């Protein structure tokens, strides 16, 4: 089988730089080449854990959390929570709107016999 592909991949068998189409069931189907150079990387390839150990990742996450906690504490002293609540409350209307009941549409239809 490998010899057959090598024979077909010779410059004489190539058309427009690729293998000619194959007929299957009366329709032309393109035939994919089995080049290792142009093939996609393996889907099951796993990253090595040696690049970034989990302990280093945990330390960087903890440092980021400590920095954020310190900043949030400073902001809470500068801006009290009551002021934030008042700023976000909706103004209450002085006059309540009365909601009218929806109008019923009665459609006259003939009775079923």
Curated annotation (Swiss-Prot):
GO biological process terms held by the UniProt record: apoptotic signaling pathway; cellular response to amino acid starvation; negative regulation of autophagy; ribosome hibernation
One Pfam family recorded for the sequence: DAP
Region (Disordered): 1-57
UniProt keyword list: Translation regulation
Molecular function terms from GO: death domain binding; ribosome binding; translation initiation factor binding; translation repressor activity
Disulfide bonds: none
Subunit structure: Associates with ribosomes; preventing translation. Interacts with eiF5a (eif5a and eif5a2); preventing translation.
Biological role stated in the UniProt entry: Ribosome-binding protein that promotes ribosome hibernation, a process during which ribosomes are stabilized in an inactive state and preserved from proteasomal degradation. Acts via its association with eiF5a (eif5a and eif5a2) at the polypeptide exit tunnel of the ribosome, preventing mRNA translation. Plays a key role in ribosome hibernation in the mature egg by preventing mRNA translation, leading to ribosome inactivation. Ribosomes, which are produced in large quantities during oogenesis, are stored and translationally repressed in the egg and early embryo.
Family that this chain belongs to: Belongs to the DAP-DAPL1 family.
Annotated protein name in UniProt: Death-associated protein-like 1.L
